[in-house]
Amino acid sequence: MCVLYGTGHEYYSWTPSTSSGANLAGSVLSFGGVVFGSVIGWAPIAADYNVMLPEDTSAWKVFGLTFFGLFIPLVFVETLGALYGSALVNNAAWNAIYNDPEQGLGSVLGASLSSLNGFGKFLVFLLALSVVSNNVPNTYSAALSIQTLGKPFQRIPRFIWTIFVAVVYTVAGVAGKSHFSEILNNFLSILSYWTTPFVVVLALEHFVFRRRNGYNVNDYGDRSKLPLGLAAAAAGIIGVVGAVLGMNQTWYIGPIGKLTGTYGGDLGFEMALLLTSLVYLALRPLELNSFGR
């Protein structure tokens, strides 16, 4: 990655944005939604990788390692992506490669490293392997997530689910290879539409409703002692509805998403956060009073 920063530096553009006012705000909101989607996707699975830490591990240490373990690499890579996006404006050859359905972003990186000859090809090879290695945690966590759906799913060995997930995303990747950047951009945007309600419900449950009493770990295997999830389900559904109202995608623009500038701005995750919070804070006390759990 550091080499990529160097090989593309002569083409980086610092040209001020041509948009202003509400149009600029809409663009920033939409871009922010993509960035948020790339980060928030770790929220449902982060605990899979720190659950084995000693019980007396400082909460601040867990938070710090998790936060900075995500923040530093994500900012580093996304800044590089922004710089290469600006380089496409100044390098016609790279721009042509990027817009070629048969090549795309990976070929742009290859062209950037071509001046290094054999070493550049070696780095491209390492980049390809890094994509595979980065998918390993996602694949493992996907298998765990499937098993949380219920005992019928737990009866199937985890490695079977892991293979199944790998086959699914491999087929999807091959089928969408000609439109990879467009699909990835849309996926990251809509990813936050459901992960935001998920995170909000967990955060409110932890910091508000379990602030004093905490958790009894022995209850996790006993459904009669677990929350019914009525408040969570209602809040999640309303949150997704809010996301739909605020979304701004190529295939659909919600009524609230149209309000910012000429082309609108994506307010999907913000609307999901707001409505999920309001509904859960209103309904969870009623659920506790009615069912005691």
Which residues fall in each region the model found?
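Hydrophobic, membrane-embedded alpha-helices of multi-pass small-molecule transporters
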Residues: 2-8, 18-86, 114-139, 225-243
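Inter-helical loop and helix-membrane interface segments of multi-pass membrane transporters/permeases
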Residues: 5-30, 98-104, 220, 247-265
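Helix-loop-helix connectors at the membrane interface of multi-pass transporters/channels
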Residues: 51-54, 136-164, 209-210, 214
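Alpha-helical transmembrane segments in multi-pass membrane proteins
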Residues: 65, 69, 73, 77, ...
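TM-loop-TM module centered on a large, flexible mid-protein loop between adjacent transmembrane helices
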Residues: 80-134, 152, 173-181, 185-189
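Loop-to-transmembrane helix boundary motifs in multi-pass membrane proteins
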Residues: 148-181, 223-243
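C-terminal structural cap/anchor segments
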Residues: 167-219
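C-terminal membrane-solvent junction of multi-pass transporters and transport-like membrane proteins
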Residues: 199-282
